[in-house]
Swiss-Prot record:
InterPro entries named among the record's database cross-references: HutG (IPR005923), Ureohydrolase (IPR006035), Ureohydrolase_dom_sf (IPR023696)
Catalytic activity field: N-formimidoyl-L-glutamate + H2O = formamide + L-glutamate
Protein origin, superkingdom: Bacteria
Protein EC: 3.5.3.8
Binding note for cofactor: Binds 2 manganese ions per subunit.
Gene Ontology BP terms: L-histidine catabolic process to glutamate and formamide; L-histidine catabolic process to glutamate and formate; putrescine biosynthetic process from arginine, via agmatine
One Pfam match: Arginase
Gene3D superfamilies: Ureohydrolase domain (3.40.800.10)
CDD domains: Formimidoylglutamase
Segments passing through the bilayer: none
Gene: hutG
Lineage: Bacteria, Bacillati, Bacillota, Bacilli, Bacillales
Binding-site list for Mn(2+) 2: 157, 159, 245, 247
Job of this protein: Catalyzes the conversion of N-formimidoyl-L-glutamate to L-glutamate and formamide.
Protein name (database record): Formimidoylglutamase
Organism: Geobacillus kaustophilus (strain HTA426)
């Protein structure tokens, strides 16, 4: 079910009502109701769309609570300072909410919302929700691109999420679903934990010809090796979407997730990967998933997720001034 944006999420400290250099995001955000006809987007525009759903996590035997994340992350974003270039417009496009365990219907609805934003010329940032968010996100990107475009999916994650879906989709099946139904998609996962995936899942990754880099490869560096692989991957595709699972981050920095990672990525390393990926001209859309405010400690996971979303905004190549 679609819910229009809630202005109540966008409040916070006010340092000035006149000096725009002192503004925060809550003073610049615009509300966009997708149930109404869309205005023509600014030349450089982006929109947040929430996916309040953790039904996929429940089906995957995980710990629920991620459906609370869109509201919490938006409230944390509201307080961050505005550093975007002049002329950029940022919208809150509301939320798609999963009702009565209707995961598949909700993913379809999210896809329609994302497609509408992209077709209107906006960059989209989807705030999940469990990682089942990524499937709905993909549906929207594919609709916007058309059936023939080669799409690269970059996933920053501790897990492959290539589980079988004989008993229905979950938060651990979506990339297998996508690869089974779309031969114009390739998949590259950064941050894989050897102790977070069975030998069967590593075998499945080989079967599906997935590219991946282990967490310890990324941590040992140099990061330029990852950058080189990202560039090669993007070069093979017409467009790229980024999906980011917060359980890729070390549990010390991101305890508020369903499946915390004791040997996860450092936030600064993840930030560098986000910056590199979204600054590529082929990257058109981003999602961030698996924040669970009910399991968080002092709001640190929510705050980190909001910072990652802002980093995506700041470095989206399509939001930079035209030269």
């Amino acid at each position: 079910m679609y819910q229009p944006p809630d202005a109540g999420h966008w409040t916070g400290r006010i340092d000035s009502v006149k000096d725009e250099r002192a503004f925060r995001l809550h003073q610049r955000i615009r509300l966009l109701d997708l149930s109404q006809p869309l205005e023509t987007a600014a030349e450089r525009a982006a929109a947040f769309i929430g996916f309040a759903c953790d039904e996929g996590v429940r089906r995957n035997q995980g710990r629920q609570g991620a459906k609370e994340a869109p509201a919490a992350v938006k409230a944390a974003l509201a307080r961050l300072p505005w550093h975007l270039p002049e002329g950029v417009v940022v919208y809150d496009a509301g939320d798609v909410v999963c009702i009565d365990e209707r995961l598949e219907q909700s993913q379809t609805e999210l896809g329609k919302a994302v497609a509408r934003l992209l077709k209107n010329g906006m960059a989209s940032i989807v705030i999940g929700g469990g990682h089942e968010t990524a499937y709905g996100h993909y549906l929207g990107v594919r609709e916007a691109l058309g059936t023939d475009a080669r799409l690269g999916i970059l996933n920053i994650d501790a897990h492959f999420d290539l589980r079988p879906y004989d008993d229905g989709p979950t938060s651990g099946t979506m990339f297998r679903q996508i690869l089974d139904q779309d031969d114009q998609v390739s998949y590259f996962c950064l941050g894989i934990q050897r102790l977070g995936n069975t030998a069967a899942l590593f075998a499945d990754a080989e079967t599906y010809r997935c590219r991946y880099m282990l967490e310890d490869e990324l941590t040992a560096g140099p990061i330029e090796a990852a950058y080189e692989q990202i560039e090669k991957f993007a070069a093979d595709h017409d467009a790229v979407m980024l999906t980011f699972c917060m359980d890729a981050i070390s549990a010390a920095a991101a305890p508020g997730v369903s499946a915390p990672s004791p040997f996860g990525l450092a936030p600064s390393l993840a930030r560098a990967l986000i910056r590199r990926i979204v600054s590529h001209p082929k990257t058109i859309s981003v999602d961030l998933c698996e924040v669970n405010p009910l399991l968080d400690e002092g709001g640190k996971t929510v705050a980190l997720a909001a910072a990652f979303c802002m980093e995506a905004l700041l470095h989206f190549q399509r939001l930079q001034p035209r030269r």
